[in-house]
């Protein structure tokens, strides 16, 4: 099979930052899909992206489609010939649709009679000839939120396209799209290599562009940024703070990244470090520098998109830009310190949280009520919770948070400490939002845990009540994150909250017209759905989680203890046999009904059933005690000891015997066992694990 390495590059105007990686990655998957569907053998597909291009390289691409064997079933022979043995219109029409004479059709004999069959072969087309249609399909399916048109081009794209490179090894394949024809030329760096770049071969793509001051691979640029930035940070006596998201964003803004250090006035360090870091990272796309103790240093590192002839001018330019941003933040900080958080409470009455859910003040009161009730479960000081909940949203009206919304909670903590509130109350003002992302830290204080749980209960009920349930990629109120955060809080902080009654309490805080109480079970179901995702990420088999959830438990701490006991038990020697027996018991009782009568020992006839019942009676009280104490590992070990007696029972005992009394007694025995199993989980669900 002849193969080539195919390179396709779309040269564009400056792309949106997120589009660089998102469209490159999505395009690689789409190319794999369309080539596979078109029966075109191919190897690895690589994705490339810079601010001015998207590209894909397909290795070991067959130059021709795979030939296809075709078989079509036509009319029955009875319908294909008339009484004179002449071909009917049905037969002639079928032959014509296959492009052959009717005499060329085969006759196949089956159990249902004889049928006309067409067998043929469709020769694969040259991939070069198919490329325009394949390319169009990929372009149409790229996940571009907003497409634009330019000039008289018939096709829309994320940004205007200026050139199209299509190379099969070192040969240009013809393709015309976006109003431009394919060629072997790419774009070099806008400043360092303004003239077009000739790509010699699909395999020399990276090297040819690097010679033109373009690092086309995104991860290579990320690595270069990491190395350069940390090297400069070391020279400054520190270490750069390098969030992965910022590294990737800067890599998507540059084609030839060059790190440059800058400095700012030490007086700005009097502000909270989060303010400076947020300004540097989120607004200036620069990296902060910390010392070995984690203290912020008066430096930053920017990444330029070129090698400047006058690096000092570039440094001064960056310093000139960042200085007024810090000065503004310093002004906000000083102004905010003049007012206690209580002063902002009246303003919350005028701020709409959500049209149907009321003002921020109303949300504050709802959360405050729930949080104060929760103190009985979290052992948090009720007065501290009351104060923290009352002031929870006050910092949203401060000048700093109005300018930097991402600092909500953080500034609340600083302002609370400044006005002399307790450290735990201050910390809770920040912790109410924890965790802020998947895998993020949880609240550490009892007050923070309490406030965070109350906040999430209110947000989930409110979101569902206004029809804002997460769907696909849409989650405007971050309810998915809220649910996962609530799950982590309850489980990892061991808060034995019962979901249903507490969701009902939260729903009861909303005005009746909203009908929030009607959504309690929907929210509960959604939380349990996210709970399954929580365990999937920990590589716990879904069947184990489903077995526990089948008991309809409401306490996530208890559910977690059962899941974590079942997971290792399922890998034990006894588990496979035991689970199979549990499923067999479930099926027998489902078909024949459970028996609530007591087991009569005088009706136990076979040695296997006598032994099984004896084993069960010996362990039953210990099993109940272990379950009552939440010691599910011990309980499962006890149940696991029944694996062999159960095997012997099903091998030697006929449950549905002709003697009705014995039959009922055996069903009663199985009913007792099933009730015991269900003290932990519906073990029959995991029989196929």
Curated annotation (Swiss-Prot):
One of the GO biological process terms? glycyl-tRNA aminoacylation
Lineage, top-rank taxon, reads Bacteria
> If you read the UniProt record, what top EC class would you report for this enzyme, in one word?
ligase
Q: What is its main location?
A: cytoplasm
User: Do the record's keywords include Phosphoprotein?
Assistant: no
- Record Pfam families: DALR_1, tRNA_synt_2f
Q: In which compartments does the protein localize?
A: Cytoplasm
Q: Which GO terms describe its cellular component?
A: cytosol
* Family of the protein in this entry: Belongs to the class-II aminoacyl-tRNA synthetase family.
Q: Name one GO molecular function term.
A: glycine-tRNA ligase activity
Indicate yes or no for the key word 4Fe-4S.
no
Q: Which UniProt keywords are given for this protein, alphabetically ordered? A: Aminoacyl-tRNA synthetase, ATP-binding, Cytoplasm, Ligase, Nucleotide-binding, Protein biosynthesis
Q: What is this protein called?
A: Glycine--tRNA ligase beta subunit
Q: Which reaction does it catalyse?
A: tRNA(Gly) + glycine + ATP = glycyl-tRNA(Gly) + AMP + diphosphate
Please describe the quaternary structure of this protein.
Tetramer of two alpha and two beta subunits.
EC annotation from Swiss-Prot or TrEMBL: 6.1.1.14
Q: Which gene encodes it?
A: glyS
């Amino acid at each position: 099979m002849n193969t080539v390495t195919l390179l396709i590059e779309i040269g564009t105007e400056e792309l949106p930052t997120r589009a660089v990686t998102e469209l490159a990655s999505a395009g690689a998957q789409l190319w794999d899909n369309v080539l596979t569907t078109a029966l075109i053998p191919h190897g690895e597909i690589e994705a490339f992206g810079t601010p001015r291009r998207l590209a894909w390289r397909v290795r070991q691409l067959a130059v021709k489609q795979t030939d296809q064997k075709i078989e079509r079933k036509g009319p029955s022979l009875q319908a294909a010939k008339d009484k004179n043995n002449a071909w009917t219109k049905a037969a002639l029409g079928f032959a014509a649709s296959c492009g052959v004479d009717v005499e060329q059709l085969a006759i196949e004999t089956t159990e249902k009679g004889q049928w006309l069959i067409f067998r043929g072969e469709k020769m694969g087309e040259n991939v070069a000839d198919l490329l325009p249609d394949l390319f169009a399909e990929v372009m149409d399916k790229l996940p571009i939120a907003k497409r634009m048109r330019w000039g008289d081009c018939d096709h829309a794209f994320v940004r205007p396209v200026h050139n199209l490179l299509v190379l099969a090894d070192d040969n240009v394949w013809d393709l015309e799209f976006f109003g431009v024809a394919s060629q072997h030329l790419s774009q070099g760096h806008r400043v360092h290599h303004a003239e077009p770049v000739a790509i010699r071969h699909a395999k020399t793509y990276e090297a040819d562009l690097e010679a033109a001051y373009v690092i086309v691979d995104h991860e290579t640029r990320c690595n270069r940024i990491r190395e350069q930035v940390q090297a400069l940070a070391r020279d400054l006596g520190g270490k750069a703070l390098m969030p992965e998201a910022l590294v990737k964003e800067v890599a998507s803004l540059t084609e030839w990244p060059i790190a440059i250090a800058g400095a700012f006035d030490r007086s700005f360090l009097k502000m909270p470090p989060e303010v400076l870091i947020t300004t540097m990272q989120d607004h200036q796309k620069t990296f902060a520098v910390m010392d070995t103790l984690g203290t912020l240093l008066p430096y930053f590192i920017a990444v330029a998109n070129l090698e400047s002839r006058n690096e000092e001018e570039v440094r001064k330019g960056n310093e000139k830009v960042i200085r007024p941003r810090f000065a503004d933040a310093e002004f906000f900080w000083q102004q905010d310190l003049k007012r206690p958080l209580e002063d902002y409470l009246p303003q919350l009455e005028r701020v709409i949280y959500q049209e149907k859910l009321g003002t921020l003040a109303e949300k504050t009161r709802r959360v405050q009520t729930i949080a104060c009730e929760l103190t009985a479960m979290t052992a948090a000081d009720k007065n501290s919770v009351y104060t923290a909940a009352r002031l929870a949203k006050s910092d949203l009206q401060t000048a700093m948070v109005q300018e930097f919304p991402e600092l909500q909670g953080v500034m609340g903590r600083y302002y609370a400490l400044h006005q002399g509130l307790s450290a735990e109350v201050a910390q809770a003002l920040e912790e109410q939002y924890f965790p802020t992302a998947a895998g993020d830290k949880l609240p550490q204080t009892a007050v923070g845990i309490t406030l965070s749980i109350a906040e999430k209960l209110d947000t989930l009920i409110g979101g569902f009540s206004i029809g804002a349930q997460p769907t696909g990629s849409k989650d405007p109120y971050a309810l998915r994150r809220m649910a996962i955060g609530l799950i982590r809080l309850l489980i990892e902080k061991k808060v034995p909250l019962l979901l249903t009654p507490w969701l009902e309490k939260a729903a009861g805080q909303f005005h009746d017209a909203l009908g929030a109480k009607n959504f309690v079970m929907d929210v509960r179901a959604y939380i349990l759905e996210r709970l399954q995702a929580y365990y999937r990420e920990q590589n716990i088999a879904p069947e184990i989680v489903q077995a526990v959830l089948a008991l309809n438990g409401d306490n996530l701490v208890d559910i977690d203890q059962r899941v974590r006991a079942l997971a290792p038990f399922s890998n034990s020697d006894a588990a496979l046999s035991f689970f199979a027996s549990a499923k067999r018991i479930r099926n027998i009782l489902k078909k024949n009904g459970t028996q609530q009568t007591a087991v009569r020992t005088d009706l136990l006839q076979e040695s296997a059933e006598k032994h099984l019942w004896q084993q069960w009676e010996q362990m039953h009280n210990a099993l109940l005690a272990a379950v009552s104490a939440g010691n599910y590992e011990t309980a499962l070990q006890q149940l696991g000891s029944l694996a062999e007696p159960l095997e012997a029972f099903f091998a030697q005992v006929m449950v549905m015997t002709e003697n009705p009394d014995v039959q009922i007694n055996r069903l009663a025995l199985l009913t007792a066992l099933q009730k015991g199993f269900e003290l932990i989980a519906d073990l029959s669900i995991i029989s196929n694990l």
